Amino acid sequence: MSIGVQSSGINISNAELSRLVDAGMSELGGKAVRDDGRALARAEAALAAVVGERVSPRRDAGAGAQRVELAQPKPAAQTRATDRRTVSGMEREHRRLAASQMPAVTGMHEALVQRHVSPGGAKTPGEGGATRVGGDAPRFSFAEDKAFDAMIALGIAMQKNVQSDLVMQGKLTTLAHDAMMSAAAQDRSIGAAQMTAAIAGGALQAATSLGGAVQQMKGLGTKSMSIEKELKPQAELKQFHAEQALELRGINKPVLSNDEVSHVKVKRETGESVRHEIDPGGERMSDEHASVLAQEAPARQHRIDMHGMRHEQNLVKAGRQQMKGDLIQSGGQVGKNQIDGASAQQQGAERAEQKEDESAQQTAMAAASARDEAAHRGRDAAQKAIDAAKSQVANDNAVAAQVAGNLRT
């Protein structure tokens, strides 16, 4: 069995203790029984010299024995190196702390870094005349009560920081949820825009197609009316004109048969009878009749020509109506394309906002994860420091108890 003091670097084995005791006992030899008190005093003095203690020879008034006063243990080089590594780790952890952490945690880390250094790293005014680093604040190791209290305070602050981390993580999670809901709303908005564009484009195209069909039907009606009112009378006039022309030439006139009379007697008002011969061949027309037919022929031809002109005008009007119908239908298609383009532009803007919301969601989740990881690292570091402080204090207490027990025996 051996007794180890971690903070001071002292390691005393049973063999060493036996050697120290035997050293006192060998000097006495056979007088050990008679001179028990002196041997024990010399053994205690030798033990105190090994562990770095200062012996003050004080004579007890009653028993006449020496009292031993233990001096402050001096840390070994191994303990200093351990303390330096601990401080370096705390400094790195302090630099990792984000500005959004609780001020109590950041301040506690800073205080520990400033106050906790290895005993060899800071010189007191009694060691070389140098002042303490960091002002007049005393430097101490974890083995001292103040350092242990500071680590306990750090643990309490870290426990308080857990609540702050949870609140912040909840806020970041809520932000990510809101971003996700906004992205879903953008999806619904895109679907609604597509449906609106489809309905509006279909309605516009249907209306323009109907309007174009109506105009084309009007054009066809104009053509039908022109045929009925212009071409039909024109045909009748042409037929009558042709018949009159045949009569002027003496064709198709009535011809007398052989048994009919060849003359007509006409009695005038004076009582005188006048005989008129009838041309049996029907080859001649009276001059009066021929004159009337000849005067009416140009007027009939003019009416025939006017019917033709009005028919052509009606055809032009019908063509314009049909063209108007085609333009209305084409305009409906153009309007539908414009609606589709506007809907596509709106959908593009909605998709851009959706991507922004998704990016915000990912950023919030990443920030929450990073903050949780940083808080976890900070808690682990604080817990390790607290465990190290507890272990070192426990070791020091055990060593002190063992030494005190050995001195009593």
From Swiss-Prot:
It holds the Pfam family IpaC_SipC. GO terms for cellular component: extracellular region. The keyword Secreted applies. It comes from the Bacteria. Residues 268-287, 330-396 are annotated as: Disordered. Residues 370-382 have a biased composition (Basic and acidic residues). InterPro entries: BipC/SctB. It is found in: Secreted. Keywords: Secreted, Virulence. Residues 360-369 have a biased composition (Low complexity). Belongs to the SctB/SipC family. This is Effector protein BipC. It comes from Burkholderia thailandensis (strain ATCC 700388 / DSM 13276 / CCUG 48851 / CIP 106301 / E264).
